């Protein structure tokens, strides 16, 4: 297996070998770049952007771009175009301003769009998002945990072609629209939560807990490899991609949504 996986060394060689074999069998689920990600299959993986009755399109002027970001923005847009995250568009009734954010990694930026005007007219999706405390309560007190992470989470969901123009943003080099679900869109958390619940519903609260694109498999070690397999089978069925760099398999303590825990209880101590 050419990709590096993080696996806890708390178990015997036979058990670790079973985990390695399993990850090799399903290594197609672990792309290393966005271009290799297939996107979630079927209507489940397609987002619509319904608007309130009487909603009128809004065209906003671009925000002023700090000159120190111009070259970085140009390079980031080129990456997004090459990856198919965005595509050029000549004209759109909806235009929102682009926003540039610094990443934690020094020198890198994230391109976002200020979608507040669109969000005001976006029909609300009431699907519930997970409660952090409930997830933590359900995960505590287990023998072993594996933490998996969805690769580019929201971007695995495509925007329906008829709705893409609503995500248009314009800068001095042209106008672009998203082909995949962007961050900052009002219903994105609810839509993503629904997808995850639909895919994994038969496993949730039994040996799997989900928190947006963070999915924790838990239980007894003698059943853990089988539980991991069931989850990976579902991922393959629906063409869900995982980020191997952010996955940790088979550890006796857990770390989820910023809270540490141990095998027997939830606490604030070190993992």
Feature names for model-found ranges:
Residues 1-271:
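Retroelement reverse transcriptase polymerase core
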